């Protein structure tokens, strides 16, 4: 029986995000020392050799692995023009990495502040994706085919993908078809795509795995009222997440990101 604690993780970014991705990856390594193995798959959208060397140097310090995968080749089946950077869609194609059945994906604007090993014990059953519930304009929830009863997950900060099931159910091609149906520009881009295609097979993670800005800005009852949500976390769950976050997601709304001057994010000092 194999009891090794192995984290398989993915990032997708262009060269100008390499600095932020590097800091996120460093925080991942630093807060998961107890993992037996960490493999980081980087979907490479023209990252320069100097930045690849820097990223490999971070991995070497922690005795971890970085694997670069050419994004253009990985996404070649999505033969449609889009207004958005192709890196944004990278997570839709991770099932092509056949040696991985369970993958954590991160955006570059995340900082890992705790162990993620408990995620390895989650029973995904028939769930295609697990993530933290997000706050979204009800109009866009309707646009992607969901109702107020559905819990929309944030696919930007951190999600857990059941790639074994993605391959079995051909989810990659279903995502491509959805993107093409909107001529390359579906509502909420990759997030809208994942929430639509996986709408009946999502698992909700505790909020500490993707602490997002609205959780700091509004009390729970106001969030439910503003976004017409029937189900959300309790105020106690949010407060506990703020005290002991596992991942902080520095999104651009409500607060400036911490690499900008005059950032007002309440956890900017962690960055």
Language model regions located:
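Short, charged, surface-exposed secondary-structure boundary motifs
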Residues: 77-79, 138-143, 214-216, 259
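Short, surface-exposed amphipathic charged segments that create phosphate/polyanion-binding patches used
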Residues: 79-88, 144-148, 219-225
């Amino acid at each position: 029986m194999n009891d090794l604690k192995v984290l398989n993780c993915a990032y997708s970014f262009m060269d100008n995000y390499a600095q932020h991705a590097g800091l996120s990856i460093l925080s991942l390594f630093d807060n998961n020392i107890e993992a037996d193995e960490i493999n980081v798959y980087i979907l490479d959208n023209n990252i320069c050799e100097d930045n690849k060397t820097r990223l490999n140097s971070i991995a070497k310090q922690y005795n971890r692995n970085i694997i670069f995968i050419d994004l253009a080749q990985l996404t070649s089946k999505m033969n449609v023009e889009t207004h958005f950077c192709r890196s944004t869609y990278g997570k839709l194609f991770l099932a092509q990495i056949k040696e991985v059945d369970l993958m954590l994906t991160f955006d570059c604007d995340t900082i890992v502040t705790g162990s993620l090993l408990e995620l390895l014990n989650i029973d995904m059953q028939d769930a295609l994706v697990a993530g933290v519930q997000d706050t979204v304009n009800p109009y866009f929830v309707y646009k992607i085919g969901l109702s107020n009863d559905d819990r929309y997950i944030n696919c930007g900060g951190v999600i857990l993908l059941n790639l074994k099931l993605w391959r079995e159910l051909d989810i990659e091609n279903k995502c491509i078809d959805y993107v093409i149906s909107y001529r390359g520009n579906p509502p909420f881009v990759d997030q809208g795509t994942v929430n639509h295609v996986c709408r009946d097979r999502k698992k909700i993670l505790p909020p500490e795995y993707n602490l997002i800005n609205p959780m700091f800005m509004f009390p729970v009852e106001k969030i439910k009222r503003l976004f017409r949500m029937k189900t959300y976390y309790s105020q106690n769950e949010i407060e506990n997440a703020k005290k002991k976050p596992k991942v902080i997601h520095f999104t651009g709304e409500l607060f400036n990101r911490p690499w900008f001057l005059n950032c007002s994010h309440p956890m900017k000092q962690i960055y």
